[in-house]
Regions:
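Exposed extracellular interaction/assembly regions and N-terminal maturation sites
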Residues: 1-10, 16-105
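Residue-level signal for pocket-adjacent positions within structured domains
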Residues: 5-8, 79, 113, 130, ...
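A structural detector for beta-sheet-dominated domains
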Residues: 13, 56, 73-75, 85-87, ...
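Extracellular disulfide-bonded cysteine-rich modules/repeats
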Residues: 21-28, 122-132, 168
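Intrinsic low-complexity, repeat-rich intrinsically disordered segments enriched
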Residues: 30, 40-54, 112-115, 134-183
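Short, surface-exposed beta-edge/turn micro-motifs
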Residues: 67-70, 90-93, 124-125, 157-158, ...
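Beta-strand-rich solenoidal segments
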Residues: 82, 90-91, 104-141
Length: 183
């Protein structure tokens, strides 16, 4: 019986197979696992098109297995709305950073499913997961300490809530302070 491969590209060796190379293949599998749970990679995005990320079976090369990594930073100057896809059937957690420049959206999705979209000014990091069909935003729950930073409420970034100083909250609409609340 010949080896088969998991969705992440791990070689699943058959009993009695790979005599003399079993150790090397196991080391490759361990490197693949490492990249899947702790790997970081930067990926240039095709401007106004689709960038398909892939996983190559039994291969630890970064450029041919970007979709395997835990943390993916999307880069490049885009001049049109762009889509980045990961293979269908992969069930995995991703931390995705939109590090692109240009006032266009970037969608991160599975090849044939749905996903999340970074707004035109949303140069942030998102925790998402693939359920094998779609990319789902993991979101967050509970209290969040903004540490005086702005909470951006819309895609173009001009509606915000800020607590710049102690005991005062500012609400900006269309970039101008419209409401202030003080204690």
């Amino acid at each position: 019986m010949a080896s088969s491969f998991s969705d992440l590209g791990l070689e699943l060796m058959a009993t009695g197979e790979n005599a003399g190379t079993w150790g090397t293949k196991t080391n490759t599998n361990l490197q693949i696992i490492e990249k899947s749970i702790a790997g970081y990679v930067e990926q240039a995005v095709t401007s106004g098109g689709t960038t398909a990320l892939s996983i190559t079976d039994g291969d630890t090369t970064e450029s041919t297995s970007v979709a395997r990594h835990a943390v993916i930073k999307l880069t490049g100057t885009i001049t049109g709305n762009s889509i980045v896809t990961v293979p269908d059937s992969i069930e995995k957690v991703y931390i995705v950073t939109n590090g692109t420049s240009g006032a266009y959206t970037v969608q991160f999705k599975t090849a044939s499913g749905t996903g999340i979209t970074f707004g035109v000014s949303e140069k942030t990091t998102r925790l998402v997961y693939s359920d094998g069909t779609n990319i789902v935003d993991a979101g967050f729950g509970g209290a969040s300490d903004m540490e005086g930073r702005e909470l951006v409420l819309d895609a173009d970034g001009d509606t915000t809530i800020t607590a710049d100083t102690d005991d005062q909250i500012d609400i900006k609409i269309a970039g101008a302070d419209d409401f202030q609340f003080t204690a």
